[in-house]
């Protein structure tokens, strides 16, 4: 039996996939029980000016008279942790990645989700959470507000105005939970962002 609680706010953040793959190959029999058995990731497009202002647009506000606006583009590629209320949802949440820990062979995973907005608004980004299946009928999730994990927020570099019934197509990639990429289309507006672009490049 393998029991692990290396769960980050977006499920894979603490490298649970590579850890389980390694432990399963070296330490477990073929019929071993793994807890959690699976981890699914859900996304939802959100209109949440509060978290966007605190996390991204703050860099455009010239704090203490300093122009830090060039850093806003880096902030827009960070996967932030924070609570997002359901009142900000612009569509119904959808499953984007499903990982079966009993069979998964790589820690690099990807998936796709499609949404249709249920109301108009300003789409600031996407909120996400995990759902871990521990056993039949027993799940652990940070979907509901109030957990210590909170949620994750994947911002857009530029918020997009949407009308009701706007189609949204999102692809999500995770490289062992260490780097993330979210890309797709909001109506006809493309976006492509990744956490690897969240830090200024350095030159030696």
Regions inferred by a protein language model and the residue ranges of each:
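Class I SAM-binding transferase module
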Residues: 1-204
């Amino acid at each position: 039996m393998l029991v692990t609680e290396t769960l980050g706010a977006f499920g894979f953040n603490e490298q649970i996939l590579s850890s389980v793959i390694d432990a399963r190959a070296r330490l477990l029999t073929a019929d071993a029980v793994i807890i959690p058995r699976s981890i699914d990731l859900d996304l939802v497009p959100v209109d949440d000016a509060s978290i966007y202002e605190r996390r991204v647009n703050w860099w455009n506000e010239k704090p203490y008279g300093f122009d830090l606006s060039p850093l806003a583009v880096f902030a827009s590629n960070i996967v932030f942790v924070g609570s997002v209320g359901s009142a900000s949802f612009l569509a119904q949440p959808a499953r984007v990645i499903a990982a079966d820990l009993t069979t998964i062979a790589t820690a690099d995973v990807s998936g796709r989700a499609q949404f249709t907005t249920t109301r108009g608004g300003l789409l600031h980004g996407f909120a996400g959470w995990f759902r871990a299946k521990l056993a039949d009928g027993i799940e652990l999730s940070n979907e509901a507000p109030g957990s210590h994990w909170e949620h994750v927020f994947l911002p857009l570099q530029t918020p997009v105005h949407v009308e009701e019934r706007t189609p949204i197509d999102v692809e999500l990639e995770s490289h062992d939970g260490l780097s993330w990429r979210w890309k797709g289309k909001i109506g006809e507006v493309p976006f492509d962002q990744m956490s690897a672009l969240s830090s200024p490049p350095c030159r030696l």
